[in-house]
Amino acid sequence: MYPNQTTAAALPRRNALKVIAVCAMSPGLAGSLNAYAQASNPFEKTQSTQLFEQWRAMSRVGYGPTPQLVRALQTASSPKVWTVQQIDLAYAASQVAPLMASDLSSLNAPLPDIFDAAQRERQARAAIKAVTADSAGNTNTNELLNNRNNRRMDFSEPADPLYFNRSMVQKAAAWRLGACSQPNDENPLLARMTEFWFNHLNVYSGKGAVRPFIGHYVVNVARAHALGKFEDLLLASARHPAMLYYLDQFQSVADGSPAGQGRLRGLNENYARELMELHTLGVAGGYSQNDVHETARILTGWTVGPNEANGFRFAQRLHDTGRKVLMGQYYPDGSLNSGEREGEQAIRRLARHPKTAARISLRLAQFFVSDSPAPALVSALAQTFQNSQGDIRVVLRALLESNEFWHPENKLFKTPMDFACSALTTVSSTDKLADSTDRRRLILTENYLSEAGQPLHDWQTPDGYKFDAATWLVPEALTRRADFALAITRQVSDLDFLQPYLSATTRAAIAQEKPALRAGLALASPDFQYK
Amino acid sequence: MPSNILKPHPKAIDRRQALQTLLGVATACSAWAAPMAWAQSARPGQSEGRLVVVFLRGAYDGLSALVPHGDANYYALRPSIALAKPDGTAQTTLRLDNTFGLHPALAPLMPLWRQGVLTALPATGSPDPTRSHFDAQHQWEIGTPGKSGNAAGWMNTLAGSLAGTSADVRAISAQSIEGAENKPQAVGVGEANPQILAGSAAVQLVAKGQAATRQGAVGDERTRDAVMRLYSGQDEISKAFRAGADSRRQTAKTLSNAMSESTTSGMGSNDMNKDISREMQLANNGAGNAQGLLLDAQHLNTLMRQDRRLRLGFLSAGGWDTHANQGNALGALANNLGNLANTLVQLRREFSQTNDVVVVASEFGRTSAENGTRGTDHGHGNTMWIMGNRVNGGRVHGGWTGLGIGNLHENRDLPIHNDFRSVFAQLLRSTQGLSNANIDKLFPGFAWDKSLDSMLRT
């Protein structure tokens, strides 16, 4: 799907360490816990501990192994060293535009162009509606619009103006699935952090106005700030059309603003509430209904700017210039005139709040370590977050160097997204041509995610997806993983590089079956469901 | 990573326990570990009641569904989104009495109202003041206002308590999962794992939409054998997988058979299929949000009809968080309400035996006044709907003090005149024969609300 390029991530520094040969008869990881516990000298870890730590690094810092990643881990001085190295590599990668197949690149087009095309689609649809309104005034647009097949991820032709939004949603999905499954093209930790932040600052592709901006938001908000300062990320999301539309902020104005025809417009609390409840402080963060109202007043006039490069405009004339009190502080403060700056100050203040540090730290620990991370780890991360003014790189270093991250008892069950991306990663790594991701596989993957209850960019509410086993380890849903594993490995003969990471029991069960089934069974195995 | 060293996390224990019980693992810390015959059929000789809860996530706007057209404040508070007073023409409120009426999109419910099997309670909810969707939903689903920690869902607890009380003990099929006593009493369609069904009792969770009808890989014997060998262990995930394969095959067969029967017999299915294909179209366009609810309800109907052991059903739909441009007689909310009405009519077809009850509720209500963007923000009290033969329907129940500013909660929202737990307490005592002590296990600290005693027929 991308030009075949080797990135820094694929070229680990050779640390003059001997390559550890992986023995095909290894006992798998079943014994690794004991081995780990008995490793009195950390420099003499047993082979199964090595394998265990390699798996953990590849599956949590990225989306699972490829032969190339396995080699990188084997040649690194330790899985921990490789893991920590990814932080700076991911940061460097986040500072440049992502690799993108040319037929997907319009998802990252300049925002004014996206606004224009979305406008053209609205006009085209309105024209159809006008034609097909029946005598009762009901329109049958849906039947008309559905008279064609839009389910193929084929973007070789320019999008029909009528289907611009849909094509943008699909391109965003295609790029995301490519990025999470091609560690040569996208640093795996960056793909992980993009997932984490998109989910934390969720927007929903089912909301009409949001749809054409989904991919742009993923790339320029979640990815671009994935390892930067949290407050910059938060402000970028606050000003992005996808978020402005999703939580209705774009139309929240000072109460009593004129709206034409003698009507008045006013406040909408939606974004203000979720900014505090979900993006920053958390529901028990000590704010009141009145604080929600005051934040909404502070942010009046923050709206979309279809002609602006960043898609954002501050409409001073729709701004509430009165004095507000948010959590005990006045906005604007004495030195300011009332305007855009007070909103920026309020958002930065929320971003730096200790409750925010605690909330982000807990969610990161749940994403990387365990469903119920040790409180001591979370508070240490929160302290790091505050000491570094919300520098995500510094927090990640503390997290990935922690004993908890490496502890065998801190298990994580893969979410459908983890499972889909890791299956896609292993399968794509067997392709002879590394520069083309098979779009049929992407469609399969997208469909699996929808069926599993974790459709890509398509969670309706601003809380984002849960990551815990309690949500996803459900009997019937487990069997759907097997469907996907078998479907996506139809043309894949073997995944031998996975073997050392599977338990002896699993390997024996797979060996009994005919070769055509083996790759699918490896991905469907219980071992592959954990990261 | 290898499954034999798995240990459930303490926090995840409630939902994980569900699996363990399903798999015949004793759960020492569960009050319901041993099923007790603590509920008797409410009326001997009558069919055992079945309870279906339809949960509207996102806080639906009850004041648009059950319209207080007789209250002048309603029109003052909502200059652009109020439903017009009833005048008998299309697009106006459908009059129920001098105070209330139905949204025109709810017209399909009018016959049920007139038959007296449908009622609404206009100002119900949880006493906890939170305006967070996610906290409010969590508290509603665990049956404990104000509690934020992990706990079992109250429908799961109820399912566990009903286990063993069923008079119908079905022969166990060869493929049956380990332990007939662990057969689910509750089924949820559509959501991955809703909190309300999470806990130590076995429940059946069925995929949303058409996916529920497909057996997938486990439908093919060779593949199934191969996959089952991978999951032949005694660890948690293996047991869960085996139970899932079994349940999924059964579900898909049941639904497919029902589908082919209805298409060959033509039992009202043409209209239904037309409805559903339209739903699907809407879904494909990202238009409606209660889209898919109709199909999920149809699946729920079929599954609960075929397996009489299933006494509890759960459905949900999102898309009710109407902060902007919610419309009135037409618009996004009207479309959703239309979907909801069709769903309820569909559920009525199945759940019309003596003690069957269908309940519609949401986590909280919305502001009484419209906001500055022709929508509504997060509120407090809301309308709950109850449908069933035992319902003293065709009239509104519960408290109502109008929309005068002095009568609003925090001068902005509907108050709570009736706790949602009191409403369920009435239903559970009358249709499931639960004692107050047992209801208190589902809703710790609930209080009996005598003002609702007339809500059901004895």
Model-assigned labels for residue ranges:
Chain A
Residues N41-F43, A173-P183, Y217-N220, K229-F230, ...:
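Short alpha-helical segments and helix-capping/turn motifs at coil-helix boundaries
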